[in-house]
Amino acid sequence: MKLNEIRERFIKFFVRNNHKQVFSSPLIPEHDPTLMFTNAGMVQFKNIFTGIQKTDIKRAVSSQKCLRVGGKHNDLENVGYTTRHHTFFEMLGNFSFGDYFKETAIEFAWKFITEELSLDKNRLSITIYHTDDKSYEIWRKVSGFSNDKIIRIATDDNFWSMGNIGPCGPCSEIFYDYAKPNLQNDDRIVEIWNLVFMEFNKDEEGNLQKLPKKCIDTGMGLERVAAVMQNVYDNYDIDLFSALISKSQEYCGNVENKAAHKIIADHLRAAAFLIAEGVLPGNEGRNYILRRLIRRAVRYIHQLGYNDPLLHRIFPVLIDSTSSAYMGGVYPELIRAKSLIETTLKSEEENFKDTLIKGINLLKKFTTDLKPGDTLSGESAFKLYDTYGFPLDITLDILKERKINFDQKGFDNAMEEQKERARAKWTGSGEKSIEQIWFNLIDKFGKTEFVGYEFSEVKDAKVLVILSSKNEVIDSAKEGEKITIILDKTPFYGESGGQVGDTGSFIIPSITPVLDTKIQKKNDRSCDRITEGIAIVENTNKVNDLYLHRCIVKSGSICKDDIVTASTDKERRQNLRRNHSATHLLHFALRKILGDHVTQKGSLIAPDRLRFDFSHNTQVTRDQLSLIEDMVNSLIRENLSAFTKIQSMNQAIGEGAMALFGKKYGDQVRVVNIGDSKELCGGTHVERTGEIGLFKIITECSIASGVRRIEALTGQEAIDYARDNEINLRKIAELVKAPVNEITSRLSILNQERKESETKIKSLYKKLVSAENIKSIEINGMNFVSHSFTDIPANIVREFTLQQQKPKTVIAFTAMEKNKTVLIVKVSKDLVDKISTKELVSTVTGGVCGENAELTQTGCDSSDIFTAIYSYLTR
């Protein structure tokens, strides 16, 4: 049975049993700073398991993309050398959120593997946690197994947890026996399914608390079960990897080196999925993990004797619908990102080639005298890593092949010394977990109804919650207080998708004071207002579907349950619309002019400007920028209609809509259509492109490896920018005494004249230096030459000093540079062993000096400097 068929059967089986199919979440976990990558199927349901997040879903089934490189689950070093380790893999899973528990979960698992997959139950065995008597009883009833086939395990192998903290519970594992006597036990018996009975949540101290609801989390490695179904005991012999490895062997040959081909296939697949989610090679965090994967694969390509970029040539196998390695159907992001993936892989291979060759040669040099069993020093490995950029894991791979040990402690010490030097500059990742308070509020009041697409003002919004500046719930706020307000509905756009939040005001009507003292409020926060209250909305954020209005009470007061008029700043809102729609047009133009490898990496939509970050490996030329700008302005002049549609995710992508790589969308998405531009977007937009008026690019630059940034203006801001440039041009024209259209030629002439003048001035200075009355005295058989140049630049004096080649001579000159005295000291080569200029100057000035033993230049106090040098030479 093929891998794709197994996945399909699994999903359909559980859908038939009333499970909702939930699509894979991104490899980059959302709102979870505890994980670098999604490493299990349950990650996207973590907040549901803990009770933080509420859901209407009772049962779910998924095929989840997973990556295990780093942290508790790190399989990188084992890849290629074992039969079952991967960096990227798919995890099939069924989940229950307070619905069914152990008995039903075990029944589902048994039915699927014995009926859907038709596995021989005599080849199966079960493990359970040693105290889990309930699971033992259920397995006995469902499977009919004897005691020796249901094994109790007392270790943590059968008590599952995601990490040091989080949901956990006892688990039951299903094993398959290949029953081949020529296999080692580790290869013969393989775990194929893990059923986790989520009952607890583990805190940072290791304490276990009962979860609000008992849940089920199961995980079946798709590659492992495919190996069982295809009767191969090495995962890399299944249909998917066979196709990738065949393509690798087609280019590289050397079929005997199986480990190298396995590593290439595994790392290529992992890298492709990361790039498809917008991760690009870099030197930190997830970007560095991607770089490690690509570079480790490149090292094995080089080992196979293939010296040209290769990964981008193998990648198309993953999106070839006729290939057994086809993954583009289930994961269409691979197809959408084809150009970006191929460009990134090729570029990274090309950039790493010289480093790889140099590093391998240096490692050979460091290990020339080492025999198997000897140890490479940690300092040498760190020098390769830190100075030459040679990855440590590649060093370890090569040492492993040569049976040379590695001084891990020495490497760690060198690394720690480097970290100490950089620690003062470290600022952390900046990631924050979602605060519990927002979950509690949305659970109590529900989502904020956003009406800002249709309205810029609503007159009947109800105040549901008021939070103090310390995020404490309060009943009311008075003049001068900074607060956060949550309404039942709002026209204010909450900052998201790169677009900043709306600003504006709340008008709170006056209330007749309560005269009956018997019903007077017990606290001092009164909701009685003789005059209307006004709250200024300074920003709006969106957190977990709650719209948070950050306000300051300008006058009067505001109270819980008040009915307010909520008004956005309409002019500012319109400017945001212009810039957001212009960003879509810019994205469209970039892909047309530069290629469809361009994808959005980030954006800022502010009322006065826009910023767009995108993937591209080279500088955008001036001609290309002009073409991009012209295309956007042409689309503006066409006055195209901008409209939105709510569609299913699959339908939107099928119609060519652009989505942000790595972002998880719901079943229904909002698509913004502007001409041929289609993007998934929740922002506010113009009704027609003509409202944008004008588009002007002001800067283009690199912000990271493979990522460029364009900043631009629209509307009146663009007009003002053009007008300011015109005014500046006219001023320049007046200064150079030329018409505006002749400024360039006039400046060229003036620049040439300036260079000629500088040459003449320099020549005159040299003559002045030579004409100075420079004194020389003899000290202990050497000449001491000193002079103070008061009107000659230091660079001229330095050049003159370097020209002096008289033996047994010490020269000390002072000159002026930017109104400061500069000391220049030179010692002839035959005196360098006796007198160092660095030591001499440090002694007489009291400072730390650089340069070299023969020549040193530094700032100094001009008074008595020559006397001090004389004393040093005669000591």
Curated annotation (Swiss-Prot):
Catalytic activity as recorded in UniProt: tRNA(Ala) + L-alanine + ATP = L-alanyl-tRNA(Ala) + AMP + diphosphate
Enzyme class: ligase
One cellular component term from this protein's GO annotations in UniProt: cytosol
Manner of cofactor binding, per the entry note: Binds 1 zinc ion per subunit.
Entries under Gene3D superfamilies matching the protein: 2.40.30.130, 3.10.310.40, 3.30.54.20, 6.10.250.550, Bira Bifunctional Protein, Domain 2 (3.30.930.10), Threonyl-trna Synthetase, Chain A, domain 2 (3.30.980.10)
Cofactor(s) recorded in Swiss-Prot or TrEMBL: Zn(2+)
Stored SUPFAM superfamilies: Class II aaRS and biotin synthetases (SSF55681), Putative anticodon-binding domain of alanyl-tRNA synthetase (AlaRS) (SSF101353), ThrRS/AlaRS common domain (SSF55186), Translation proteins (SSF50447)
Domain remark from Swiss-Prot or TrEMBL: Consists of three domains; the N-terminal catalytic domain, the editing domain and the C-terminal C-Ala domain. The editing domain removes incorrectly charged amino acids, while the C-Ala domain, along with tRNA(Ala), serves as a bridge to cooperatively bring together the editing and aminoacylation centers thus stimulating deacylation of misacylated tRNAs.
PROSITE patterns per record: AA_TRNA_LIGASE_II_ALA
Gene Ontology biological process terms in this record: alanyl-tRNA aminoacylation; negative regulation of DNA-templated transcription
Protein location: Cytoplasm
Similarity section: Belongs to the class-II aminoacyl-tRNA synthetase family.
UniProt keyword tRNA-binding, yes or no: yes
Keywords for this protein: Aminoacyl-tRNA synthetase, ATP-binding, Cytoplasm, Ligase, Metal-binding, Nucleotide-binding, Protein biosynthesis, RNA-binding, tRNA-binding, Zinc
Enzyme Commission numbers on file: 6.1.1.7
Main location (coarse class): cytoplasm
Listed name of the protein: Alanine--tRNA ligase
One Pfam family linked to the record: tRNA-synt_2c
Role, per record: Catalyzes the attachment of alanine to tRNA(Ala) in a two-step reaction: alanine is first activated by ATP to form Ala-AMP and then transferred to the acceptor end of tRNA(Ala). Also edits incorrectly charged Ser-tRNA(Ala) and Gly-tRNA(Ala) via its editing domain.
Residues that, per the record, bind Zn(2+): 580, 584, 681, 685
Domain of life from the UniProt record: Bacteria
Gene Ontology MF term list: alanine-tRNA ligase activity; aminoacyl-tRNA deacylase activity; ATP binding; tRNA binding; zinc ion binding
